[in-house]
Amino acid sequence: MSDSTPVRAPRHPGIYLLPNLFTTGAMFAGFYAIVVSIGGRFTDAAIAVFVAALLDGMDGRVARLTNTQSEFGVQYDSLSDLVSFGLAPSLVMYNWSLSSLREYGPLWGKVGWAAAFIYAVSAALRLARFNTQVAVIDKRYFQGLPSPAAAAVCMSFVWSMDNFGVSGPALDMFTPVTAVVVGLLMVSRFRYYSFKSLPMGDKVPFLWIIVGVLILVPFFVDPPRVLLVVFSLYLLSGPIVTLWGLTTHRKRQRRGVI
C-alpha cells in the first residue's frame, strides 16, 4: 500500500430501529409531560408519563421478540427512563405544587426545588444501581421501588387531585413529603416483586380472568384513582414484604437454636 492510498475509517455498527423507536417514543412522552406541565396542563402531563411507562414496557419485549437486543438499546433505555420517570415526574410535581412553596419565603422555595431534585437524583441512582447489579440480583424481585412505579404513584396522585379540582398549592405541604418519601424508596433496599416469574404464556386458572375483569372495569370507570390505589399498594408492598421476610427469618433462626 502506497502512502497516497486513502485509508478508510472503520464503519460504525448501526442500531436496531424498531425497539429504539419505542424507547424514543417513551422519552418523547416524558419530555412532553414536562412541556405541558409548564403550561398548567397537569392531567395531560400525568397521562403522558403513563404513556411513557407503557412504551417503556414494550421496547424490551419488542427487542426480544425480534431478536434485536443490543448494549446500545440497554443504555438508551436507561437514559430514556431517567427523562420519563426521573426528570418528568419531579418537574411536573414542581410545576403543579412544589413551586408554590416560594410564596412562604425564600427558604420554603428552596425546600420545593430540593424535594423535586431529591426525587430526580434518587431515580438516577436507582437506575445506575439496577444497571450495575442486573446480572447478580434475584430476577423475581427489584431492590428498591422501580422508577416507573414511583412515577406512577406520583402522577396518579397529581391526576386524581386535578380531576377532583384540588389545586397543587392546596397540597404544597404534602407534596414535598410525597416526593422525598417516594424518592427514598427508590434507593432503599426494600424488595419489590418484579412479576417476571408470572406464567404469561402458560394456561392459568379461570379465576384469573374474573380477577382481571374486576380490575379492568373500575379502571375504565375511574382511571386515575384506580391507578393511585394500585400503585400505592405496590409502594407499600416493599416494606411489608421485606419486614415480613426478616421476621420470618428470625423466627426460623430461633427455632434452629432451640
Language-model region placement:
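Helix-coil boundary and interhelical linker segments in multi-pass alpha-helical membrane proteins
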Residues: 32-47, 89-114, 157-174, 220-225
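Active-site His/Glu-centered metal-binding helix of metallohydrolases
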Residues: 28, 54, 58, 62, ...
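C-terminal membrane-associated helical module and adjoining short loops/tails
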Residues: 1-7, 139-258
